[in-house]
Amino acid sequence: MLGRCGGSSILGGKMLIPLKIEGYAHQRFLRGCIMRDRVVIKWGGGLITDKSSLCTPNLEVLNQLASTVAECHAAGQEVILVHGAGSYGHLRAKNWRLNEGHIPGMLQPEGSICSSQRDAVEQVRREMLELNQHVCDVLNEVGISSIVHPPHQWATNTGMNFRGDLGRFNHPNGRKIHITFGDIVEVEGEQRFGILSGDDLVVRLALELPRVKRLVFAIGGVDGLLRVPPEFATEDDLIEIWSPDIEFEGVHQSDIDVTGGIGLKAARGAHVAAHEIEVLMVNGGKPERVLAAMLGNPVRGTIVTNKQ
């Protein structure tokens, strides 16, 4: 971290010289090249879309979140962005049971524009690219260009152990940020296809890319993990530090959501935290909190740990 060390060190035979430059407090220099610390941020699908209405973005929230990325980038951190699907994926995937993989002879759900599961797979992929374009557009408006990595083009299988080369996220990006998202990918064997959740993507990105300092989940409607259901919660019910042995309450819209909801986020966050990476959950509707979490500043939310 810049400003914390006045010496230098040798890593792999190369000189690493910490320097302090005004406005860039989170970067190092490797043989003259800026090596920024990284933060992986997950924008929840329910946060950036209207989950009750098919393919409807929440542009107000998207614009607010885009500003946090620009400010974090200006502060000297490199951002890796992963976003969820919300109403662009879950509703159609639920109707066609795409999370279960190939179902021989499945009948067309009433009112569906798709004629088969495979047709639905391709439609959801197109819709995810449409949502991603909204994300790229709001980022472009604040001066941030994007390098997009649709998982169906480079990843196979589902869960944390999916297969795919994450080196594509490691290329120098200047004023650009790398983006990926939850998607439907090909799966080996009889299943044929399945849903690769953004919550699984962030685990691998946080653990396998160098210089990642923290993982932030920007979630919708709540300040973090709660001791009671959200509709009954007061400010005192926020779990400020959570580990897997602590029970919590959360809303999982199983009638819509085909991934694991906030429970999956907590479990995946604990897995990352076990590797000494900071993990936080914050209210994504409060952009000042999202920015503070990305920068590692004190913020209202839940710190996820793996300590029992």
Enumerate the predicted regions with their spans.
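C-terminal accessory domains and tails appended to enzymatic cores
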Residues: 302-303
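N-terminal amphipathic/basic-hydrophobic helices that include classical n-h-c signal peptides
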Residues: 1-34
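Nucleotide/pyrophosphate-binding catalytic subdomain
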Residues: 23-24, 29-278, 284-292, 298, ...
